[in-house]
Design a protein with these regions (language model features):
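Short, charged/polar surface micro-motifs in flexible loops or helix N-caps
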Residues: 31-35, 62, 87
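Basic, amphipathic "hinge/linker" alpha-helix immediately C-terminal to the N-terminal HTH DNA-binding motif
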Residues: 76-95
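Histidine kinase transmitter module recognition
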Residues: 28-31, 72, 90, 94-97
């Protein structure tokens, strides 16, 4: 039985709706907690994308409201975040979806002779 991924079914790719910045933040947090500046630096190194503070903190707020990340106790003036178990599960589903679409796209390019 196929799962309708548009209606909240198990395995739904909830990250399709939150944007690239949110996905990059989850990927960055997958190897451990980070505060805002560390996230900006890691994402720039990882993906060549420099998130501005408004984009970063807007995405952090959305991810926290969705329960995909959580804040940790502040260290001095820094406020670290970590990925939650539901956040890690959502990231896995999203990355699996990207891999399937990427493989299909590559196959179609090959079959099309492009």
């Amino acid at each position: 039985m196929a799962v309708d991924r548009r209606d909240g079914g198990a395995g739904q790719d909830v990250l399709r709706r939150v944007g690239e910045a949110s996905v990059l933040i989850l990927i960055s947090l997958a190897d451990g907690p980070k505060h805002g500046y560390a996230l900006i630096q890691d994402i720039k190194e990882l993906a060549g994308v420099e998130l501005g503070p408004g984009t970063l903190y807007g995405a952090l707020d959305r991810l926290e409201r969705l329960g995909l990340i959580e804040p940790l106790p502040a260290e001095d003036r820094r406020h670290p975040y970590r990925i939650t178990a539901p956040g890690a599960a959502a990231l896995r589903v999203h990355l699996d979806s990207i891999e399937r679409v990427s493989a299909a796209g590559r196959l179609r390019l090959q079959l099309g002779g492009i």
